[in-house]
Amino acid sequence: MATKFPKFSQDLAQDPTTRRIWYGIATAHDFEMHDGMTEENLYQKIFASHFGHLAIIFLWTSGNLFHVAWQGNFAQWVADPLNTRPIAHAIWDPHFGEAAIEAFTQSDASCAVNIAYSGVYHWWYTIGMRTAADLYQGSIFLMVLAALMLFAGWLHLQPKFRPSLAWFKNAESRLNHHLAGLFGVSSLAWAGHLIHVAIPASRGETVNWGNFMSTPPHPAGLAPFFSGNWSVYAANPDTTGHVFNTSEGAGTAILTFLGGFHPQTQAMWLTDIAHHHLAIAVIFIIAGHMYKTNFGIGHSMKEILKTHRSPEGTPFGGMLGAGHDGLYDTINNSLHFQLGLALAALGVVTSLVAQHMYSMPSYAFIAQDFTTQAALYVHHQYIAIFLMCGAFAHGAIFFVRDYDHEANKNNVLGRVLEHKEAIISHLSWVSLFLGFHTLALVHNDVVVAFATPEKQILLEPVFAQFVQAASGKALYGFNVLLVNPDSAASIASDYIAGPHFWLDAINSGVNSLFLTIGPGDFLVHHAIALGLHTTTLILVKGALDARGSKLMPDKKDFGYSFPCDGPGRGGTCDISAWDSFYLAVFWALNTAGWLTFYWHWKHLSIWQDNVAQFNESSTYLMGWFRDYLWLNSAQLINGYNPFGSQQLAVWAWMFLFGHLV
């Protein structure tokens, strides 16, 4: 008799209802619940799957390189980055008839093509690639790497090459390996690539495998390194008149601290970026030698956590209970806790990437490709919200499956659970506070509608303006730190050798560094904060109530996602941890919408040299509806109509699709 799906659960396989299919799909990746699963086998399966994941990533990036090399216009774009639209790939089967084929035959292409708004052209150009041959080589290299990863995944499932459970539980060795080996050495390697390949390329010099060993990146070679005269590497940087990809105005420096942006490319100086990666490498390689492993020297994570509490007699002495005692084993024995921490950290980093990619662009000319800037910001913020929601989902699963009350008695984790009502009620209060203050947008809408705009509530974000002023923004008239030439900060910065451009960048008005903010920004800030805090409230409540609540004290016995109306008692609909995650995703998407709309309109006003429109219209609802949404979507809605279609047609469909969802 043929084995029915799912093979991993005999109970489900014998279920005569459609639950067999739906529960089978839902639990396919829930390895720890599969029949016959041991803890060691669980770790081995997940470890091997990481190699598969890496293989997919390398295959995908290889495909990007291959299709641009084959069907793109990289060489033409390199010749004129500001006036050539980069092609991602051809469209094999353009729909919507002849009009669509004509509309999508763009950027001097001979057939229908998609334009690249991912920024990959800018990245490849910045790191030293110049021809389609370079892209093909990169593609082949990544394809080989993908094959190696697949082999490594298969190999680590073979009995002789399966790591033991003790190997997986060796947290200090793993931490050292990740800090020094992955972060440290990869940062050092990247600094090396920038210094040896990218910086020479930006100065019109091609470095490849043929001349790599015979072309020193600096005329002084390694002598200054070994003699300790490192400042030589910062001397003679590129001038403000440097023309990227040529020797005109180029210097010889490889590691600088210039600050600000290259005037032509509007991106950070490559020599600053190389310096940053070298510094990161040094810090992480040192950090990766801090923890006690085979040699019996260094820190013990367990001891650090055990003693991490305020001593008696100090201000917080005794107030924090057992502190972090017990956390080492709790975290080390729970994959869900580890995954939750990893997702939370990655979520924060992804949001930071979104913020930094536009405010401090690293790639040549990307700041002048406005659609790409918008696409990358939206992409990274949406990725960030999903990662953050996932962090709380796995935090809730940890509380249901892995939390041991006795092992965490009176420590920080136990105490969080014990006073969860206070945490939840404070989050609720903060959300209400932010919501009521956001209603100023509605008040302003009413008074503008009744032709009394002077009655609007318009508050300047003085504290944020003060922070910007302290960093060097002179517009607001504060006399503090870097805007005050006589302050200690200004005097100290004058002593840093060489030219510096950070104050020029902060005060330029045409980039996105320290955007000028006013009452509209202040109101939107509170609206976005409302969305973030409400999302957090739902996620935190779902996780902290996952084990049990007043309504259902024994909730942990029913798992993470028990059915609506649940185990034979009424009123359990919408109270599983799964339900709170589901609701939080709605709020997270809502918040990401507000956030990206704000970012987009703010930047449209800068790019169109019309900041007055944002400043005047962003303080009331109709301003947003009329001057942002309607004004900027009219063209899109006409992507297709009875008279034909244009290249926005596909996005017009997406516009409809998004609203139908």
Swiss-Prot record:
<keyword id="KW-0408">Iron</keyword>
<feature type="transmembrane region" description="Helical; Name=VIII">
    <location>
        <begin position="522"/>
        <end position="540"/>
    </location>
</feature>
<feature type="binding site" description="axial binding residue">
    <location>
        <position position="659"/>
    </location>
    <ligand>
        <name>chlorophyll a</name>
    </ligand>
</feature>
<dbReference type="GO" id="GO:0009522">
    <property type="term" value="C:photosystem I"/>
</dbReference>
<keyword id="KW-1133">Transmembrane helix</keyword>
<dbReference type="InterPro" id="IPR036408">
    <property type="entry name" value="PSI_PsaA/B_sf"/>
</dbReference>
<keyword id="KW-0249">Electron transport</keyword>
<dbReference type="GO" id="GO:0046872">
    <property type="term" value="F:metal ion binding"/>
</dbReference>
<feature type="transmembrane region" description="Helical; Name=III">
    <location>
        <begin position="175"/>
        <end position="199"/>
    </location>
</feature>
<feature type="transmembrane region" description="Helical; Name=I">
    <location>
        <begin position="46"/>
        <end position="69"/>
    </location>
</feature>
<comment type="function">
    <text>PsaA and PsaB bind P700, the primary electron donor of photosystem I (PSI), as well as the electron acceptors A0, A1 and FX. PSI is a plastocyanin/cytochrome c6-ferredoxin oxidoreductase, converting photonic excitation into a charge separation, which transfers an electron from the donor P700 chlorophyll pair to the spectroscopically characterized acceptors A0, A1, FX, FA and FB in turn. Oxidized P700 is reduced on the lumenal side of the thylakoid membrane by plastocyanin or cytochrome c6.</text>
</comment>
<feature type="transmembrane region" description="Helical; Name=IV">
    <location>
        <begin position="273"/>
        <end position="291"/>
    </location>
</feature>
<keyword id="KW-0411">Iron-sulfur</keyword>
<comment type="subunit">
    <text>The PsaA/B heterodimer binds the P700 chlorophyll special pair and subsequent electron acceptors. PSI consists of a core antenna complex that captures photons, and an electron transfer chain that converts photonic excitation into a charge separation. The cyanobacterial PSI reaction center is composed of one copy each of PsaA,B,C,D,E,F,I,J,K,L,M and X, and forms trimeric complexes.</text>
</comment>
<keyword id="KW-0602">Photosynthesis</keyword>
<dbReference type="Pfam" id="PF00223">
    <property type="entry name" value="PsaA_PsaB"/>
</dbReference>
<keyword id="KW-0560">Oxidoreductase</keyword>
<feature type="binding site">
    <location>
        <position position="573"/>
    </location>
    <ligand>
        <name>[4Fe-4S] cluster</name>
    </ligand>
</feature>
<keyword id="KW-0472">Membrane</keyword>
<dbReference type="InterPro" id="IPR001280">
    <property type="entry name" value="PSI_PsaA/B"/>
</dbReference>
<keyword id="KW-0813">Transport</keyword>
<feature type="transmembrane region" description="Helical; Name=IX">
    <location>
        <begin position="580"/>
        <end position="601"/>
    </location>
</feature>
<feature type="transmembrane region" description="Helical; Name=VII">
    <location>
        <begin position="422"/>
        <end position="443"/>
    </location>
</feature>
<keyword id="KW-0793">Thylakoid</keyword>
<feature type="transmembrane region" description="Helical; Name=X">
    <location>
        <begin position="648"/>
        <end position="661"/>
    </location>
</feature>
<dbReference type="GO" id="GO:0015979">
    <property type="term" value="P:photosynthesis"/>
</dbReference>
<keyword id="KW-0460">Magnesium</keyword>
<keyword id="KW-0603">Photosystem I</keyword>
<dbReference type="InterPro" id="IPR020586">
    <property type="entry name" value="PSI_PsaA/B_CS"/>
</dbReference>
<keyword id="KW-0148">Chlorophyll</keyword>
<feature type="transmembrane region" description="Helical; Name=VI">
    <location>
        <begin position="374"/>
        <end position="400"/>
    </location>
</feature>
<dbReference type="GO" id="GO:0051539">
    <property type="term" value="F:4 iron, 4 sulfur cluster binding"/>
</dbReference>
<keyword id="KW-0157">Chromophore</keyword>
<feature type="transmembrane region" description="Helical; Name=II">
    <location>
        <begin position="135"/>
        <end position="158"/>
    </location>
</feature>
<comment type="similarity">
    <text>Belongs to the PsaA/PsaB family.</text>
</comment>
<keyword id="KW-0812">Transmembrane</keyword>
<protein>
    <recommendedName>
        <fullName>Photosystem I P700 chlorophyll a apoprotein A2</fullName>
        <ecNumber>1.97.1.12</ecNumber>
    </recommendedName>
</protein>
<feature type="transmembrane region" description="Helical; Name=V">
    <location>
        <begin position="335"/>
        <end position="358"/>
    </location>
</feature>
<keyword id="KW-0004">4Fe-4S</keyword>
<dbReference type="InterPro" id="IPR006244">
    <property type="entry name" value="PSI_PsaB"/>
</dbReference>
<dbReference type="GO" id="GO:0016168">
    <property type="term" value="F:chlorophyll binding"/>
</dbReference>
<dbReference type="GO" id="GO:0016491">
    <property type="term" value="F:oxidoreductase activity"/>
</dbReference>
